[in-house]
Amino acid sequence: MTSKVNRYIFHKIVCAVRDLPRTFRRLPTPRLIMTLLVKNEEELLEKNLLFHKAMGVDAFIVTDNNSADGTYGIIEKYRRKGWVVDVIRETATGYEQKEWVDRMIWRAKTSFGADWVINADADEFWYAPSGSLKKELSKSRANVLTCEVRSMYPEEDKPFWQWSKAVRPVTDLEAYDLSLYSLFERQNRKVIHRTDGYLQISMGNHKVNLLAELI
């Protein structure tokens, strides 16, 4: 196993070196793929796919980790439409998030021609003020963009895209008996990154290791 992992790492480094000449060029029409790691997300997954397709995502790669609700049926629906280009049914009972997302990124790069990748959860909706994530990426020579995360306060009788109240983080959660994982916790930034020069994503998709970085 160690030998196999070392070969994989070496292969990624070799590919990253080959990528260097084109790493920081502007791409007028970048191919943008979103990876999604999901489990029991039937309530949100379809909304997520529709929202991001409208925002300019070209295709989705989805890993389903033992969903027991209607999640896989939604994945299959959009696979048949051609939106989901790769589906991985992960049956492991542990949570190897970094490994599973890395696998999707590598497939996005090597099998589906992704220039940029967004690694998302089903409850994350990536928004660009212009209305097009691809348009924003086409302007950039950077190969990694660090993005703020805002928790939105749910508003009754409104679809999520009309929610207008952002949550202000609470600095002393214990004083209000709030969970460390509540929407009132300060959210860590996440990254959008190119596939050229890619080496490794971090746990939680908060950072990415690239052979050369221009932020």
How should these model regions be labeled?
Residues G113-Y127:
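Short beta-strand-to-loop acidic/aromatic patch adjacent to the donor-nucleotide binding site
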Residues M1-L50:
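N-proximal low-complexity "stem/linker" segments adjacent to membrane-targeting elements
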Residues Y72-W116:
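Active-site-proximal specificity loops/subdomain of glycosyltransferases
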Residues T2-C15, E99-W100, A128-I215:
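Catalytic-site signature of metal-activated, phosphate-bearing donor transferases
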Residues L50-A59:
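Short, acidic, metal-binding catalytic loop of nucleotide-sugar glycosyltransferases
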Residues D58, D115, N143:
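Short acidic/polar active-site loop segments enriched in Thr and Asp
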Residues D58-N66, V87-E90:
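Short beta-strand/loop segment that forms part of the nucleotide-sugar
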